[in-house]
Amino acid sequence: MALGLSQVASQAASQTLDTAMAGSLTRAAGAQAQKIALDTENSILDGQMDSASKSLNSGQKAAKAIQF
């Protein structure tokens, strides 16, 4: 059974939209993955800075406690 012109056009439009949506989802997933990686790296760096600050503060408190 032959398809009418409107059915052919509808199928073509659906395929165009499907392709666009697939590309959009792929790009969004890639961007989200990059954000997760960056957030993780920032969290690690914040933790390292916090640990360094605590270490410095601890050293300063110890130095004050040793004063004669």
From Swiss-Prot:
Organism: Pectobacterium atrosepticum (strain SCRI 1043 / ATCC BAA-672) (Erwinia carotovora subsp. atroseptica)
Gene designation per UniProt: hrpA
A GO cellular-component term linked to this record: pilus
Function in brief: Major structure protein of the hrp pilus, which is a component of the type III secretion system (T3SS, Hrp secretion system) required for effector protein delivery, parasitism, and pathogenicity. The hrp pilus functions as a conduit for protein delivery into the host cell.
Subcellular location: Secreted; Fimbrium
Major place of residence: secreted
Keyword ATP-binding: no
Key words, A-Z: Fimbrium, Secreted, Virulence
Family: Belongs to the HrpA type 2 family.
UniProt name for this protein: Hrp pili protein HrpA
